[in-house]
Amino acid sequence: MKIKNYILVCILLLVSLSASAQYGKQKKADTLFNKFSFVKASEIYKELIEKDYNADYATRRLGDCYAYMRDPKNAAKYYKKAVEQENIPIEYYYSYAQALSGIEKYDESKEWLKRYKDSGGVVNKNKFLKDGSFLTNIFNAKQQYFLKKVNFNSKFSDFGAYEKDGKIYFASTRDEGVSIKHLYGWNEQPFLDVYVIDKETKKPVDFKDKIKGDINTMYHDGPVAITKDGQTMYFTRNSFLNNVKDKDSKGINNTKIYRATLVDSVWTHVEDLSINNKEYTTQHPALSPDNKKLYFSSNRPGGQGGSDIYVVDINEDGSLGEPENLGDIINTHGAEGMPFINNEGTLFFASDGHPGLGLLDVFGTISNEDGDIVDVINLGVPVNSSKDDFSFFMNEDGLTGYFASNRKGGKGDDDIYAYNRIPLLNVEGVVTDVINKKPVPNAIITLLDGNGKQIAYMETDDEGYYEINIDRNVDYNITASQKKYENDSKSFTSKNIETTVTTITVDLELTPVRDVVKLADLGIIYFDFDKHNIRPDAAKELDKIVKMMNEDYPGMVIRIESHTDSRGSLTYNDKLSIDRANSTYEYLISQGVDSSRITAYEGFGERRLTNGCDGSVNCEENKHQLNRRTEFIIIKMQ
């Protein structure tokens, strides 16, 4: 009996020790996870799943590790298992949807986004679920950007390319030529350093191309932004200055933005900035074209979500104002970062919260006439892909630049791509009245290509303006039409046009039809039986003619013709119709129409009936009414 008890105690002790060991592993994995050492943490979570110790928790954490390591294939694998768990936090629906889009399973991604929303999750307004045609629009959009690989990528992570005065600055985790490497636990790669090379260099990049001065440290450094005069650099770095590492209350070494000065071709005098705080990240500097504003991303409190984009004024003395969040048109519940502002003041940034093709995509802003940002637009393929696309930069020419991506086909982890941009081409113009030169609103614009295929069908705005996006190297025919006018058509071509040209102007002129009823939107001027006075409803119609003649066509000349029904004698009806014509004439004159612009006012009695009510058949009153009318004939328009 004692032996049996001894064996039982041993078994229980072994089970207890095993459980204690697994608990210790989970605690270690969580510690690594919280310190962003996702590679090592993922290995331990796998062990826990194999040992079936708190496997549901380890599965969720493992999916998170792969998501942070930007590995959507493996993230989707474990998130798929996670979302089948009972009482799973709904945030995992969203994470699973993001991972699915990263492996181009867009329909499934959309289903899980909907489930996330239906479960109470917040999906940014105007986003993926709201626009079912989003992906179709992205893939069918006209291509503006044409890519080429650069010769300075490595097998590691390279991004943040920034061109200045014939040199390219970029951040890289490569460390070729260095015997001792410091590795970053997030991805087990070396820490980032800033490199600078000649734009036209053909030689391999190594440690000798690291930027000269005090920019690089043993921690993350880069990317950078440089002022127009080339004398000041803003750059991202882990919180490390004067050999002091400044961690937050959780022991995390967050990023900050530092400023350096160029002295004798060396970047030095590195200084901390007032916008930094060790308790949160401040990173990804970008300068406005006039260098008076600094844009950056941060996960500081009070934002919209994970990380937001902010802007702060740079004062004359170099001090900084108070950061301002750019608001929910740009920032979402997801992550926004890597801002860049081109010469035109357009903000470009990376986001995984706006509708995209998967993971991070590059977006540009749309501003109104006052310069206020009113919307954002996905740059589409080939800049964006199902993987991470970010760190967009545009040269001053507005046509060339760089961005980074970890898409398939690259040399390493994140690769830098150069692009040539061929701007979209528009045809625009104003449709006007050929006589009074006034714009024609609501004119129908029909655009056909050289094969007669309809490319666009639209209406002009209140100012007679239209604008249509077109392809280059195509012949076109455009027609304007409106019920008050004769059509006008013109042919034009987009062939052999310089790529710097973005607009072709084709104005169209419409000739008014010689029909007062159409021009004035006129109803028929009716009279009561055996009467020639102007009824109130007739006065409203005559006022339209007054406006047309005095405001729209001050050179128009008309003739008035009045008619009766068939009841009464021929002689009586002739006189009655003349009286009606005279009443019409007198009303127009009384309202300001010059008498010289009415050549005659005549009565035709019952001679021009509009129907068969000639007295030989019985007709209802409303049919007789149709014959008691006044008409207007255009004699001249100028």
Regions found by a protein language model. Give the residues of each.
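Short, acidic Ser/Thr/Gly-rich low-complexity loop/linker segments typical of extracellular
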Residues: 449-465
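Periplasmic OmpA-like peptidoglycan-binding domain that tethers envelope proteins to the cell wall
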Residues: 351, 355-358, 550, 561-638
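Periplasmic peptidoglycan-binding/anchoring modules of Gram-negative envelope and division proteins
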Residues: 527-562, 589-590, 632-638
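A short, solvent-exposed beta-strand micro-motif common in secreted/extracellular proteins
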Residues: 474-484
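Short, conserved micro-motifs composed of acidic
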Residues: 92-95, 102, 106-108, 115-430, ...
